[in-house]
From Swiss-Prot:
It comes from Caenorhabditis elegans. InterPro entries: Alpha-catenin/vinculin-like_sf, Alpha_catenin, CTNNAL1, Vinculin/catenin. GO terms for cellular component: plasma membrane; striated muscle dense body. Residues 552-696 are annotated as: Vinculin/alpha-catenin homology 2 (VH2) region. GO terms for biological process: cell adhesion; regulation of locomotion; Rho protein signal transduction. This is Alpha-catulin.
Amino acid sequence: MAASSMSSLTSSYHTTAMPSSNSVVPPFDARNLEIKTKSIEQTLIPLVTQITTLVNYKESYMASGKPKSERAMRAALKIGSAVEAAIERFVCVGETIADENADIQPEMYDACTEARLAGASMANLSCACNDDPNSVVDKAVLVRASRQLLSSVTRVLLLADRVLVKQVLRAEDKIAFSLSRLESTRSFNDFVKVFAVFGGEMVELAHRSGDRQHDLKSEKRKAQMSIARTSLERLTMLLLTASKTYLRHPDCDSALQCRDGVFYQMKLSLELIAICVCDGILTTEKSRYIQDEPDMPIDIALQLTANAAIKQLTEMLEMIRMTVRVGAGVRERIVSALDALCQLTQDFTDSAYTPHHQREQILDFLEECRFEMTNLIQPDENEQLAASGLEVTVERLNRRLKDLSKQLQIVAMEQISEVLRANEDQVLLSSMKACAVSGDIDGVEKYMHKFREHADHMQEVCRLLHHISITDALHVHTGHVERNMRALAPLTILAGRTLCVHPSSRIARENLEVFCDTWGQAVNDLSRVAKESDVAANGRVAAEKQAYMSLPRPGKHGTTQKPSKPITLDVEDQQKMAKVGLEMKLLTSEVDAEAEKWDEYAENDIVKRAKAMSSMAYNMYLFTRGDGPLKTTHDLFTQAEFFAEQANQMYRTVREFSYEVPGSAEKSDLSAILERIPLHCQQLQVMVKSPTVGKTATFGKVDSVIQETKNLMNEIAKLVTASFVCATKYEIEFRGGSVNGRTGADGERTSRESTVWRRTPSIRRAAPPTSSHLSANNSSSIHI
């Protein structure tokens, strides 16, 4: 019923009184009732359903002219009274929110009064239809009352939503204040105290902003919120080490500049969260979080890209096709749009890394577009010929734009593939670190210069990827990958210079290591969005991480007949698991990287199982952050059980593979790792099935399960690496298919369905792949 649905859903807006704050939210516009969150939309669905039933009842009666049955009349009357009762409870919640938030009190009282009157009006109209079936109640009156009711209820919900927005902004204000205190602190003891408070405030903001992110309807805003939250999480670690380095070496200019740069990036992330929760409308002063105006707009979704320019041109051409005319205003706009596209493609043609033949192809496509544009905008004296030729010209220009878009995509993806395949980051950063520790200033300067050039190349590649992004989410993600690299590169160099000045400083070394790790995360982000962009551009559905929904349902087809009551861990427990969860995430990245090496040969069972296990471990890592598809401890345990089953299957697959490996040191290493897998699987399965009572015991079980999963994942990473070494050294390749169960002379092969592995002659391995093979696997060369 509408009553129960609305009362339960609106209860989420109930909030306790909060202290006054200077947070300012956008002013409420009663004429703009656009719904931007899923919760408001879901709250309105039951009410819309009931109102639709009432209107349809009246319409069907007027169409047939026959009195309805008593059952139908009672149902309609019951709906009217239920809607009125639900609105009354709904209004009571709204008035409670108004009492606790003085800034929205007048508007909320007014909206509640309006909703109460509209609910009573709907109930009266429903009674009128049932008391006297022959009475004439105009449908327009009923529709008008329905609109008034929906409008007033939506207004109450939007006002309540302002309270949630204000809570996020207040949490940001607390962090901004703590950042200013951290920035002015000169004592290490004071810094530790303030940072402890700052950490608690970050947890509060993470939960409030996370709830808001999941509630947003706009994919663009959700992507921006996700990026801002991830940036804050990474920057917090950088802030800790950079501040400790500066406090240890207060006279070091590079340490001060590095710390100040991290502070500035954190304030930019806070500003981006504020933009997301306020939907781009900020009434706060510009200096609220950042003093200086940034070089680029914070809302990166406003930036124009080559793909966006092509899309604008395509929409204009479609309008011309429909109207069959090109007016003076349209002519000016379409020429301006083509000029903008030509300017944006200069990032491709001016790049030193773009091959000459690809540069010429892009310029040729642009020249063809200009030629077709000239034919389109030139007036023709013969109107009949103009009308017949216009559609042909529009079709030709559309085809040229598609060809240009495809060529830009090829150029961008090839450059990204090359830079990721080279993998220069680790070599440069480790060399710079080694020179800094040894006090080799010349060596540090040398590798700093190389890293600076490499970082510029990475940013240029990111810019090309940004140009070819075709969805709102990818547009945001690719733009912020470039921005993060542009901000992180000079800070990493400053951290290296600090270590060079103080080579014996442990905290300076730790600071550089953290910056290097963060740069590696940025490179992983680039790899991920590059693959997603390639998938989206080719019209394929992006492969999601293997989610919990793929697991067997407990009780019906699963392994646990009586699942324990799901328990959701609180913030403190999640914080305790964050460290081991992060370690497991790093292992998933390592397994993914090792699995990607096999793409040169074939997509075999080892690769598939490694990627599947990496996906499941990643979901368990997200659980330690309070995110992802695993919502309760029961979900986690079921996922861990399935993870152990996958590990057992991996064991059988690699064992079959090991039969083709000749006796050697490599086979001994592989066998030694392989023997440890069943033990870890058994331990994990025992932990999952062990009963627990109480929250403390459950947390202990969760901690043990995640720790054992991490240990098993570590062995899987070693196993994949050892298998790859054997496959490449002894030229063993996967042929596909399955074989019937059989037992060899040694009695080892007993699997019913096994991977077919065969030794490959060296001459075949050395043969270069054909061009068709290269083109078919162009997208698979992007490493994650």
